From Swiss-Prot:
The gene is Arap3. Residues 82-97, 1506-1529 have a biased composition (Pro residues). This is Arf-GAP with Rho-GAP domain, ANK repeat and PH domain-containing protein 3. It is found in: Cytoplasm; Cell membrane; Cytoplasm, Cytoskeleton; Cell projection, Lamellipodium. Pfam families: ArfGap, PH, RA, RhoGAP, SAM_2. InterPro entries: Arf-Rho-GAP_ANK-PH_domain, ARFGAP/RecO, ArfGAP_dom, ArfGAP_dom_sf, PH-like_dom_sf, PH_domain, RA_dom, Rho_GTPase_activation_prot. Residues 903-1084 form the Rho-GAP domain. Residues 216-241 have a biased composition (Basic and acidic residues).
Amino acid sequence: MAAPQDLDIAVWLALVHLEQYADTFRRHGLATAGAAQHLGHEELRHLGISATGHRKRILRLLRAGSAEGFLDSHLDNTMEPTPSPAPDAQPPKPVPKPRTVFGLSNPATAQRPGLSPIFWDPEVSRNSECTQRSSPLLPSSSEQPSVPNTMEMMPNAIYFGLDLRGRAQAAQDVTPDSSQATVPTPAFRPTTGTVHIMDPGCLYYGVQPVGIPGASDRRDGRGVCQERAEHRQDLETREDAGYASLELPGDSILSLPTQDAETSDDLISPYASFSSTADRPVPLLSGWLDKLSPQGNYVFQRRFVQFNGRSLMYFGSDKDPFPKGVIPLTAIEMTRSSKDNKFQVITGQRVFVFRTESEAQRDLWCSTLQSCLKEQRLLGHPRPPHPPRPLRTGTLELRGHKAKVFAALIPGELALYKSEQAFSLGIGICFIELQGCSVRETKSRSFDLLTPHRCFSFTAESGGARQSWAAALQEAVTETLSDYEVAEKVWSNPANRHCADCRASRPDWAAVNLGVVICKQCAGQHRALGSGISKVQSLKLDTSVWSNEIVQLFIVLGNDRANCFWAGALPPGEGLHPDSAPGPRGEFISRKYKLGLFRKPHPRHPDHSQLLQALCAAMAGPNLLKNMAQLLCVETSEGEEPLSPSALNGSLLSLLPSDSPGVYNEVVVPATYRGFLYCGSISNKAGAPPLRRGRDAPPRLWCVLGAALEMFASESSPEPLSLLQPQDIVCLGVSPPPADPGDLDRFPFSFELILTGGRIQHFATDGADSLEAWISAVGKWFSPLSCHQLLGPGLLRMGRLWLRSPSHAGLAPGLWLSGFGLLRGDHLFLCPAPGPGPPAPEDMVHLRRLQEISVVSAADTPDKKEHLVLVETGRTLYLQGEGRLDFAAWNTAIGGAAGGGGTGLQEQQMSRGDIPIIVDACISFVTQHGLRLEGVYRKGGARARSLRLLAEFRRDARSVKLRPREHFVEDVTDTLKRFFRELDDPVTSARLLPRWREAAELSQKNQRLEKYKEVISCLPRVNRRTLATLIGHLYRVQKCASLNQMCTRNLALLFAPSVFQTDGRGEHEVRVLQELIDGYISVFDIDSDQAAQIDLEVSLITTWKDVQLSQAGDLIMEVYIEQQLPDNCVTLKVSPTLTAEELTNQVLEMRGAASGTDLWVTFEILEHGELERPLHPKEKVLEQALQWCQLPEPCSASLLLRKVSMAHAGCLFTGVRRESPRVGLLRCREEPPRLLGNRFQERFFLVRGRCLLLLKEKKSSKPEREWSLEGAKVYLGIRKKLKPPTLWGFTLILEKMHLCLSCMDEEEMWDWTTSILKAQHDDQQSVVLRRRSSSDLARQKFGTMPLLPIRGDDSGATLLSANQTLRRLHNRRTLSMFFPMKSPQGSVEEQDELEEPVYEEPVYEEVGAFPELTKDTTFSSTWEWSAKSDPSLTSQRSFDQPPLSKASMLGHEERIPDPPPGPPSKSSSQARGSLEEQLLQELNNLILRKGEPASCPESSSQPTSPQAPSPTSLPTPTPSLPTQPPCTSNPPSSQPLT
């Protein structure tokens, strides 16, 4: 390739497809091709060209241009021989001409301008011993004119030691017309002795012997050309040592490069990743020296100093990986020695003084430095150096360093300098290589750079500067992992330089099974489709999967041909553009590939799902090119024929260089690695302790990984001490770092191998790089090929696994699938693996999105092995290890990876909708228990409880259960706000904060809402869904503002600092949040059905709040009788303590229904009657009804009364317990399917105590499975979609699963149902069959607001008796309002209560919670019996004291009916009124009996005139007047009870 000197640099680089570096060349003053002629490997590396293949292309282009430039400048010149000097003349000292040489890997074989032509022999390149074809650029020697030799050249190793004697004779032997060409001879050739030569591979002067006259033949008989070929082969071998082995082509061109500059580039494997073995130069000189301190106090400090030929570095110790100072050789002006064994290194900024231990050591340092300085100037390297342009510079604070440092970020490394002036001179503190590093942002303005050897903590000048530095470092670290070899080859097809979906330039991702090259944004949407549809790989990172055949496919196919297939029917104007939002982008890609809406019908696969399966199979099978060509039958334009497989193969062959056969024939080489490892002994114990240093430290062995892992005592040992075969490895695990950073005895970098037979062996390395290299090598060594692409940083465990899932039942029903698991980060990858069972399909599990992780013990499994159950949305996976040891390791690793602990939103454990569990749980709790709380989210809870709750959520959110009696609403709201406030990045994204503010500044509200929608679409998926959930919750809160007094403005003020993580003074953020809450329906595209459901829920909550104003907390509910028809509906108040038996009695009395011989039972109806649950008579009805809000359709639930025969449900109303437990054979099925599968199977079940047991046999003593019945609900019926085998069955709903049980007949179904209900309520007393309400006024707790007593306390024996009497009076008064009273019956308990001692205490309204007072006894019957036995007592007690008035449930007074004038009547109504008055009189006497003074015993018999009680007066003794006689005839002041 010819390159004229004045050719523009961009055009010149485009010849090798590297025009992206044109700007880099121009920034360094290289605008034309001629200005770049002096560049070599190191110069290109300093320019920022890190890819080795790119540097090789440019150097080959330079060599080609240099050869042609030499020919152009010398073809017209004549070559005349140089006259020989006199024999006795003193030989002149050769002086080398300053020039630029190439590195070892790029020997300049072409003549450079100004070089003597005697060192360039064109005949050598035509020698048949060196090459099989001649170069068209080389003329014959007869055509070359001679040029006078104006300067003698010194022999140099760069010319491969060419023999300088007899060149003319050699040229005459091979030239057709030797008489016309005279080959010049050197001006001086020493006959014996030595000459000083410069080796470009070394940076010091050396001495090489020169042959004596007559020694034209080599010692081993090899010719010049053969030595040149071997020398070049040795150089290329050293340079390409980091590449995978390839089959070299038969024709190896070892002479001047030809016009085909891409031939040698093809020798690089397209999937190879280069790791240079000579990046770090070997130190030429090192040792301990004393360095003079720069503070001026003349103090020498002990330093370890190294000089590697490029820079002088001094360290604190010989173990430190990073120096304290770096002095580049280019910054040193001179070195000179001084007295006292000291020498000075002089730079333009300061003088460095070092002191050695001896004079000889000082002279060695001085001579070495001075010789390298001379060689540097002879080579013509510029001084000071011209490094690549920094990506970012600035001042930073470094922890552990007193003053600020000046940091410069260049490609591949971060350089630290003391000042900007030191940066300009190149004198730095240290240079940190970014390969293998990571960046971590910490609090405030700080960030950490984590290297394998040390953590550098920096502090920026501001928060914005910290983010900029962290982003730039992260991008630079990512760039170090990139390999452009595959990308350059794929981009050689111009159609692949633009994304196949959105036309973005330079796409660096590809969907390998779809044949398209895509950009990074589209790659994320392709990944969302799943690996079964689109297998996404990176062109720069995932280089291990890019075989030569796949690269050829993409080169030939191209995006244009692929789009002819995938988008052949795409309507114009419906494509994507590079700036498309993620939402429309994902929808378009799903329609294009997942649904195949834009492709034309396929002749062989009309079903799109079959086509996708065939594409995946073609990528994994042989004959990739042929199969893909048949599947992707490309539609061409009219007049053209589609690309056939033969045409495809032909086009592929046409792309291959004709002179390089076999280039793409890869030689499969097994994974090899070698190095030292600390090898522990093989143990059989689970959880063996990690390796530790000290006396019991494991031996450090030399390990070689090839066909087997062999361990030797040393590198020279002939026999291995032990070896491991790949089939012996079950699992590989990376040991976590020590929990205590101060634990220096433990090896921080270690891994373990679990072997067959339950054995384990630990290994340890010296550093993180070595550990990662060993993990990658061993992982590829024993794992299948499908796992190799998944290896990388973050690997925790990999090994063989057994997999079973109901979703794979069609593939292998009832069988375990053989797979290979790989745990990386929080993802578990499952790959097919060879084994006795069928291979498992490729799959991936996001562990943090699991709903449940549990272990089924070996006793509960048929195969007597432990199973790990992973419950995900829509499916359940069962994992089983090879043995106990590896299963325990997998369980621990998966449990740790599935947990939380981070402060990032993506690091949280997720619920079904990709919402953090902590957010979902807190919002659900507040919705259920806090929407009615006044000042919700404004009232703060206890800080300690809130912090403790947040820590529990972060540790394991799945295990946290919020319960009303254990957690307060205020603590939960504080936890939710604190969680959003402490996120690493706010839920609204810090980078989008300017866009939020820009949207808030728009004038029109409609425009602002549309802008909000646009910004929300730019958020990540988790952020977008979490924000939508939070705003929806706040929308419901403000809907209940009439109850909780929290309007939209208040909520926005409270949540803006947490959602946007601002200081709370941002008015724009408050406005944004307020408008998001108000416009929730439109911004988040809520449809009308969802909006109606929200309004229904809010209306129901509001109704509950209105009814709660009554002390009893009653709720108005609808109850149906027999059928759910409007005519059969009864509306009544339901108190929180109303039981199902009491509800039944009230409804039947209201409707006047007769009981007869059948029983009436209250049923809870779900899913419009598909499931029916009989309520136990003692169950609280309101507690069950309040749980309907958690249902997907709350309106589908209701209460229904139905007649049930005494034989079916009679046992529920008796206190008799079953003597023998219920046991029988049932057909069962689990939802979701687990141990029992997804079909109904016959199993024996047993109800024992409060547990349901699953038995293998009827007489089995140990159950296979056990379920607690605490909190379980039993429903009659089974969902129809499950296809139950019989019509009679019931569903048992447990906490995390549903158990469907099918019976043979109705009697068996009722027998099992009542047995379970009896087991759940076996501590309840027997039910009394009566028709009256026994609702008490016990203390209620509705939501989180307990109903406190109105006046005083409710404890004490006196109050107990008073409340008991008031309850009976209230019950009788209430019952008389609904239905006639029954005849009272006396009881012994009531007689005992009258004899209890009472004390003088003030009477309070009944507000206490006394469970022992729930029995319905009639106190009036006792008094009636007493009155009949002693009439005088009746007349006396009737008028001793004014009667007490009765207190109602609401606390207000009720009038007592006035007795009619005249003598008492014997009618029933008059007797009933007189009886109540007598009861009140007796109650008053009971309370005040103890307070009667002893001085007036006659008062009880003193006659008094009868006095009718005033309807408004209420005689009440007060505590302030304890001495007032209670027997006085004058009533006290009219005051209510206090």
